């Protein structure tokens, strides 16, 4: 139920330069990839939409719009993620319930002995656990954080996480993510 019917939920968007690609300017794709990597390295949560579909209505829900040929805007301050560079993050909203799912993927592993080799498959994967992952989150106005749950394939059941309140009105919280190998989800449930 974590993935079924999920919708993008980031407050930043990166526009894919499809207009330029259709015009034969494929160099913009490299700029797009470089900008996307930069956002991922800084743990900025963002959605991706093609620039030929970026109507005012489509962009209305975003606080920051990143374009390959534009000045980089300030990132949304709703989430501030601290994690190793090997960890990537994304955000989604489930179809049911008032929740957000913060997904973490850890790419840190012991590399295969042979360069440019994937090894013999999944049984050769040697992930190195992600540690010291945390984030600061601003609770949307008019909402209360009901629960914070941590999911990972290494555990049979989700665990409750306790947020640390950072301000006097309780709207800004810090959440420390437990150690995980490859994948984890933190579910924020509101009331």
Where are these regions (language model features)?
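Carbohydrate-binding surfaces of carbohydrate-active enzymes
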Residues: 1-191
């Amino acid at each position: 139920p974590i993935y079924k019917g999920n919708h993008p939920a980031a407050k930043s968007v990166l526009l894919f330069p499809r207009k330029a690609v259709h015009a034969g300017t494929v160099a913009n794709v490299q700029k797009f990839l470089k900008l996307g990597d930069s956002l991922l390295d800084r743990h900025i949560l963002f959605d991706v939409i093609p620039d030929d579909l970026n109507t005012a209505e489509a962009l209305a829900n975003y606080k920051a719009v990143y374009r390959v040929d534009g000045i980089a805007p300030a990132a949304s301050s709703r989430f501030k993620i601290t994690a190793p560079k090997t960890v990537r993050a994304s955000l989604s909203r489930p179809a049911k319930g008032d929740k957000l799912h913060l997904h973490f993927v850890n790419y840190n592993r012991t590399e295969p002995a042979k360069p440019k080799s994937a090894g013999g498959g999944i049984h050769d994967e040697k992930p190195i656990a992600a540690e010291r992952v945390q984030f600061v989150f601003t609770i949307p106005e008019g909402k209360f954080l009901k629960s914070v749950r941590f999911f990972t394939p290494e555990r049979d059941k989700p665990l409750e996480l306790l947020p640390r309140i950072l301000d006097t009105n309780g709207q800004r919280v810090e959440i420390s993510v437990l150690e995980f190998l490859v994948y984890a989800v933190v579910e924020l449930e509101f009331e």
